[in-house]
């Protein structure tokens, strides 16, 4: 299996286009296709905060429909899904940018994008186990003893990370560094927590290099285990990046 897994995009369509071209994909009829048959992987959080979230929904839906990509949802995807279902969610923490794009559309187009995203989300696995179990794509990561499980505890971990229930002074949840304790055989490729450069710890790789916060958009090439990045066009917000001891 040959796949290029892309970190949290958050509506950064311009950088996504540049990254796929750098990876050797050719854009045809609005989607990137690799001449050697490589597929794309997405760790979730396609939308929110960035300028072109709805375009990313369109593209990823088209890729998944054509079996050219593997997509797993992130916490922002989960919140957008609940918004589209009419649930009472707070339109904050970036969701407001996607909702503004959505509300600017004519009603017929609103319904089209709503249905499209609901279908994408409901058709996606919580996490993807690929290459006969040698590779797992999970938005915020996954413990080795959680692989194969789908219960509420696992869903919380996969969408939000190993949260303690406490909060940092800036309001973000305190998270344990689960990657340091991972002892599984499968490679875990994840995002969710922005880091200045791809973080390899054991057989885990965090590829969320904070594109929407002015970092970069990064892909991990599997099975080569090399990374490819393009710089962000967004303003740099250093306090959004996590450092590890």
Curated annotation (Swiss-Prot):
GO MF term list? bis(5'-nucleosyl)-tetraphosphatase (asymmetrical) activity; GTP binding; nickel cation binding; phosphatase activity
Instruction: Kindly list the cofactors needed.
Output: Ni(2+)
Question: Gene3D superfamilies recorded for this chain?
Answer: 3.60.21.10
Listed under GO cellular component are: cytoplasm
What are the entry keywords? GTP-binding, Hydrolase, Nickel, Nucleotide-binding
State the InterPro entries in the record: Ap4A_hydrolase (IPR050126), Bis(5'-nucleosyl)-tetraP_PrpE (IPR023937), Calcineurin-like_PHP_ApaH (IPR004843), Metallo-depent_PP-like (IPR029052), MPP_PrpE-like (IPR041780)
- EC number(s) recorded for this UniProt protein: 3.6.1.17
Query: For this protein, what reaction is catalysed?
Result: P(1),P(4)-bis(5'-guanosyl) tetraphosphate + H2O = GMP + GTP + 2 H(+)
Summarizing the function annotation, the protein's role is: Asymmetrically hydrolyzes Ap4p to yield AMP and ATP.
So what family is this one in? Answer: Belongs to the PrpE family.
PANTHER family from the xrefs?
BIS(5'-NUCLEOSYL)-TETRAPHOSPHATASE PRPE [ASYMMETRICAL], METALLOPHOSPHOESTERASE
Q: What is this protein called?
A: Bis(5'-nucleosyl)-tetraphosphatase PrpE [asymmetrical]
């Amino acid at each position: 299996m040959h796949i290029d897994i892309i970190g949290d995009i958050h509506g950064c369509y311009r950088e996504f286009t540049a990254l796929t071209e750098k990876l050797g994909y050719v854009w045809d009829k609005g989607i990137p296709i690799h001449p050697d048959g490589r597929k794309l992987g997405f760790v979730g959080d396609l939308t929110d905060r960035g300028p072109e979230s709805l375009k990313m929904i369109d593209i990823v839906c088209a890729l998944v429909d054509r079996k050219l990509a593997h997509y797993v949802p992130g916490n922002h995807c989960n919140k957008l899904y609940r918004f589209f279902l009419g649930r009472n969610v707070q339109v904050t923490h970036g969701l407001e940018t996607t909702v503004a794009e959505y509300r600017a559309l004519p009603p017929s187009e609103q319904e089209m994008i709503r249905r499209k995203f609901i279908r994408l989300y409901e058709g996606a696995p919580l996490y993807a186990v690929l290459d006969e179990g040698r590779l797992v794509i999970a938005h915020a990561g996954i413990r080795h003893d959680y692989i194969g499980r789908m219960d509420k505890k696992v869903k919380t971990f996969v969408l939000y990370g190993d949260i303690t229930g406490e909060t940092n002074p800036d309001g973000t949840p305190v998270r344990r560094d689960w990657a340091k304790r991972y002892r599984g055989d499968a490679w875990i490729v994840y995002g969710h927590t922005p880091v200045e450069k791809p973080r390899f710890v054991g057989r885990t790789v965090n590829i969320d290099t904070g594109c929407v916060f002015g970092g970069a958009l990064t892909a991990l090439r599997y099975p080569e285990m090399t990374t490819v990045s393009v710089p962000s066009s967004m303003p740099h917000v250093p306090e959004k990046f996590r450092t590890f001891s």
